[in-house]
């Protein structure tokens, strides 16, 4: 009979087990399809081993004590099995929870086992930094596990003993009963408690010994915590807190020994004295620390904290890889000539006139062609084209099947037909048409380009930045490839990517994805391929979750295909004496150590992922490489053309610049007083004041012979608007990652971005032009202020865009403002502005320079005509009539130039 009952439950158990294994099987299939099964298996086996070991050890120890406590409490009366079973269930649940928690620490365990030394010692304990990064987290996890085990065991054992001692029973109906009266067989409370005390003493010994270990480790954590002026252990920590923790460690261990030896020495009062002394010293040390900090340190803070401030400065520079910055003086000379401008043509011709935000809006109007396409981002890169080094904007045209009409939102369309984006758009950052629109190096569908090196053999984009649902290829349904006039072109995927949908994978993914269509669709064949995790950030973090990924991947055209490059970082929040930062640009977590050690390259067509180590000196990435052999490749394995497109990450540079603005003050006294603090300045974008953003430029650094691709950012003194310096990092392969800081003279005024913005606002002609354009129904967008070093001078360039206030706007580059020294001009093009400043040419008469005072009949008439033509132009644009739109724009131009 019992066997029949068991047989009834076997199918249900099998089904339940299959559902539990679905996630595991789906991951196994996917990792095998991308070629990273060893990574997955390493994580899986380590997690499973930790879970099993942690659970079994916890259960065996706690349940063993439960059995012992039950027998002790029951005496000769006998153990109540049901009560003991309840204790076993409690132990099993606690063991499972603890084991599950321990299994999530697989990265800490593996890093501890494979750790790489930094060969740098902390200044207080003299330990290698690797102890804090790799060993201390492991010891902390171990202590937390043991403390949870021993405390839980003490509690559950005490409950088990008390339940048996009190005569609690469970009847045949599962109801608790209490048997009152004296304990049977003549045993008193004192007798049974005496039998239970040895077990309690042993557990308390283990608890206090573990507590002693915890207090000992806490001493090390003072080196990366923040209190007061110093990041890390300061004077009070070194003289009071750390010695006090050492004393408390010894006392806690001695208390544990007293518990262990209590049966022999029979001196319970000594335990009481020990525990009392422990709390007294803990309270006194906290009070002493407060008094020392308040009465001794704060009145003489710099002298007492000077040494520790030095530790803080040096460690922070090390933590953010800023210790080897090359600082140079940059005396600003306003002696540029027209010849200098011509000699720096590569710099001038790559000044970014198009900001990525209006560029994105313009691309959406001119190059999407269909509502289901999208440009998720506009990236900045550089290419060698016909012997010229050109900075460009590039954006991938991705598929967004969520934008299909509602009636077309079918499973077949979203997962079998509209599977991929198509091509990319590339535009030089400096060129505009006569209509104020960008020129294109690559455009349209299919992509066309005058440069053979930019041709694409596989323009299809199956993997990108967007929220991309899974798709299935190699089906009986053709995939939409691209629109061609009134027709659509269809294709079939010819790559090897994806999970083969044989019977078992179809069943597994149907359950995981909640898609019955995977089982019943007649379009699928055994050769069909399922493409999962098509968002490239999700895809890369699925394989290597221990890295931190930059939120701004960028697309590259190389070797006839599209590839994505993603910056990946190793981070830690345990670098001694390094100041922590919390930023959403890299990670929501706090960190005080970061290295851009890895570049990830993802093929947009196949989804193939490669991880390349670009900073082999980073001990953290060396540790990960040992944890996962075969995952990482050396940087030299990157194809040369792709390697030429590596760039220094914008987000990391922003963090480093912010840190360097404070920590360039390496003199502890200057640092303490913040006498020379630098900040990242503000600028005006549109009509809003915002923080200045780092920007990529192609330029010739002072003293260098050729132009190169760099990322740069200016600094201003805190609470001032003038420039104090600028920071640059090289991006070209031969000198990648080299940082230089150029410092301006503190005795001479060098205009900062907000001072240039103020000069623009105060210029009557420019202000009148902006007012006029705004009155004509347009919105004036003030672009980023770019500070361009040329020779030993600075050029300031700010583009102005016009866009309609209606929906479907098409931003146009209307004017370029250039400032040099005391000169300021606004002209239709950059070249004209430079000719006005350096060539002695008379400035073109802007429309506002001819505007009469309010009430002038001629002004009112022309303004009315311009306003009317502008409204008609916007109506034509909204209806998609670009030809009519251009005619109206030309008529406006005629009125402006003739007035």
Swiss-Prot record:
<feature type="transmembrane region" description="Helical">
    <location>
        <begin position="93"/>
        <end position="113"/>
    </location>
</feature>
<dbReference type="GO" id="GO:0005886">
    <property type="term" value="C:plasma membrane"/>
</dbReference>
<feature type="transmembrane region" description="Helical">
    <location>
        <begin position="39"/>
        <end position="59"/>
    </location>
</feature>
<keyword id="KW-1133">Transmembrane helix</keyword>
<dbReference type="InterPro" id="IPR005372">
    <property type="entry name" value="UPF0182"/>
</dbReference>
<feature type="transmembrane region" description="Helical">
    <location>
        <begin position="136"/>
        <end position="156"/>
    </location>
</feature>
<dbReference type="GO" id="GO:0005576">
    <property type="term" value="C:extracellular region"/>
</dbReference>
<protein>
    <recommendedName>
        <fullName>UPF0182 protein Mhun_1303</fullName>
    </recommendedName>
</protein>
<keyword id="KW-0472">Membrane</keyword>
<keyword id="KW-0812">Transmembrane</keyword>
<keyword id="KW-1003">Cell membrane</keyword>
<feature type="transmembrane region" description="Helical">
    <location>
        <begin position="6"/>
        <end position="26"/>
    </location>
</feature>
<feature type="transmembrane region" description="Helical">
    <location>
        <begin position="240"/>
        <end position="260"/>
    </location>
</feature>
<feature type="transmembrane region" description="Helical">
    <location>
        <begin position="271"/>
        <end position="291"/>
    </location>
</feature>
<dbReference type="Pfam" id="PF03699">
    <property type="entry name" value="UPF0182"/>
</dbReference>
<comment type="similarity">
    <text>Belongs to the UPF0182 family.</text>
</comment>
<feature type="transmembrane region" description="Helical">
    <location>
        <begin position="196"/>
        <end position="216"/>
    </location>
</feature>
């Amino acid at each position: 009979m019992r066997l029949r009952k068991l047989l009834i439950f076997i199918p249900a158990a099998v089904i339940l087990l299959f559902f539990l294994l679905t996630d595991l099987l789906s991951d196994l299939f996917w990792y095998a399809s991308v070629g990273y099964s060893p990574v997955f298996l390493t994580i899986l086996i380590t997690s499973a081993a930790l879970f099993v070991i942690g659970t079994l050890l916890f259960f065996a120890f706690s349940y063993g004590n439960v059995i012992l406590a039950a027998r002790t409490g029951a005496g000769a009366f006998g153990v109540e099995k049901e009560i003991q079973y309840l204790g076993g269930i409690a132990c099993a649940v606690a063991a499972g929870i603890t084991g599950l928690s321990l299994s999530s620490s697989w990265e800490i365990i593996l890093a501890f086992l494979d750790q790489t030394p930094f060969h740098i010692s902390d200044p207080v304990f003299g330990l290698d930094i690797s102890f804090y990064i790799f060993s201390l987290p492991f010891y902390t996890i171990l202590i937390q596990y043991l403390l949870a085990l021993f405390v839980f065991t003490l509690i559950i054992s005490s409950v088990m003993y008390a339940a048996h001692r009190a005569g609690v029973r469970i009847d045949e109906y599962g109801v608790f009963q209490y048997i009152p009266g004296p304990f049977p067989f003549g045993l008193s409370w004192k007798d049974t408690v005496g039998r239970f005390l040895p077990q309690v003493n042993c557990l308390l010994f283990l608890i206090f010994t573990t507590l002693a270990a915890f207090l000992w480790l806490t001493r090390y954590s003072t080196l990366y915590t923040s209190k007061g002026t110093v990041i890390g252990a300061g004077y009070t920590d070194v003289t009071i807190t750390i010695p006090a923790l050492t004393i408390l460690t010894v006392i806690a261990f001695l208390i544990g020994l007293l518990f262990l030896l209590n049966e022999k020495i029979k001196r319970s009062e000594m335990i009481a004295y020990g525990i009392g002394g422990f709390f007294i010293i803990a309270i006194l040390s906290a009070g002493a620390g407060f008094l020392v900090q308040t009465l001794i340190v704060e009145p003489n803070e710099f002298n007492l904290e000077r040494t520790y401030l030095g530790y803080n400065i040096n460690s922070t520079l090390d933590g953010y890889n800023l210790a080897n910055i090359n600082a140079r003086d940059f005396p600003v000379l306003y002696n540029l000539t027209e010849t200098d401008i011509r000699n720096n043509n590569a710099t001038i011709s790559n000044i970014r006139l198009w900001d990525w935000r209006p560029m994105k809006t313009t691309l959406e109007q001119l190059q999407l062609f269909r509502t289901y396409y999208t440009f998720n981002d506009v990236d900045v890169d550089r290419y060698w084209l016909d012997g010229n080094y050109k900075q460009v904007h590039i954006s991938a045209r991705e598929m967004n099947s969520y934008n299909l009409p509602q009636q077309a939102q079918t499973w077949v369309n979203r997962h079998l037909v509209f599977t991929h984006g198509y091509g990319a758009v590339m535009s030089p950052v400096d060129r505009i048409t006569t209509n104020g629109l960008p020129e294109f190096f690559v455009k349209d569908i299919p992509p066309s380009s005058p440069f053979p090196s930019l041709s694409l053999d596989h323009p299809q984009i199956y993997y990108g930045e967007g929220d991309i649902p899974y798709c299935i290829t190699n089906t009986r349904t053709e995939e939409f490839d691209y629109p061609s006039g009134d027709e659509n072109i269809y294709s079939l995927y010819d790559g090897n990517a994806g999970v083969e949908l044989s019977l078992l994978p179809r069943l597994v993914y149907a359950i995981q994805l909640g898609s019955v269509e995977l089982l019943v669709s007649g379009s699928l064949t055994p050769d069909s391929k399922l493409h999962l995790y098509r968002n490239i950030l999700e895809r890369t973090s699925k394989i290597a979750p221990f890295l931190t990924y930059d939120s701004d991947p960028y697309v590259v055209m190389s070797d006839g295909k599209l590839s994505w490059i993603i910056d990946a970082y190793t981070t830690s929040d345990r670098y001694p004496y390094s100041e922590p930062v919390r930023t959403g640009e890299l990670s929501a977590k706090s960190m005080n150590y970061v290295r851009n050690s890895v570049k990830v390259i993802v093929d947009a067509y196949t989804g193939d992922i490669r991880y390349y180590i670009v900073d082999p000196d980073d001990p953290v990435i060396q540790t990960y490489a040992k944890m996962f052999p075969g995952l990482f490749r050396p940087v030299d394995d990157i194809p040369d053309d792709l390697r030429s497109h590596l760039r220094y990450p914008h987000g990391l540079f922003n963090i480093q610049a912010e840190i360097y603005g404070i920590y360039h003050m390496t003199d502890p006294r200057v640092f303490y007083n913040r006498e020379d603090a630098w900040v990242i300045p503000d600028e005006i974008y549109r009509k809003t004041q915002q923080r200045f953003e780092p920007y990529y430029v192609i330029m010739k650094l002072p003293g260098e012979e050729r132009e190169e691709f760099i990322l740069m950012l200016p600094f201003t003194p805190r609470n001032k608007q003038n420039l104090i310096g600028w920071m640059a990092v090289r991006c070209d392969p031969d000198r990648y990652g080299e940082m230089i800081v150029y410092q301006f003279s503190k005795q001479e005024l060098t205009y900062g971005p907000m001072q240039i913005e103020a000069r623009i606002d105060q210029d009557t002609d420019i202000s009148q032009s902006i007012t006029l354009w705004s009155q004509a129904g347009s919105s004036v967008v003030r672009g980023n202020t770019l500070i361009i070093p040329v020779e030993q001078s600075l050029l300031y360039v700010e583009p102005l865009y016009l866009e309609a206030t209606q929906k479907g706007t098409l931003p146009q580059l209307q004017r370029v403002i250039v400032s040099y020294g005391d000169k300021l001009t606004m002209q239709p093009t950059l070249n004209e502005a430079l000719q006005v400043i350096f060539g002695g040419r008379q400035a073109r008469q802007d429309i506002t320079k001819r505007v009469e005072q309010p009430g002038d009949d001629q002004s009112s008439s022309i303004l009315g005509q311009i306003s009317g033509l502008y409204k008609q132009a916007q109506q034509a644009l909204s209806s998609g009539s670009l030809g009519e739109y251009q005619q109206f724009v030309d008529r406006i131009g005629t009125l402006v130039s003739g007035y």
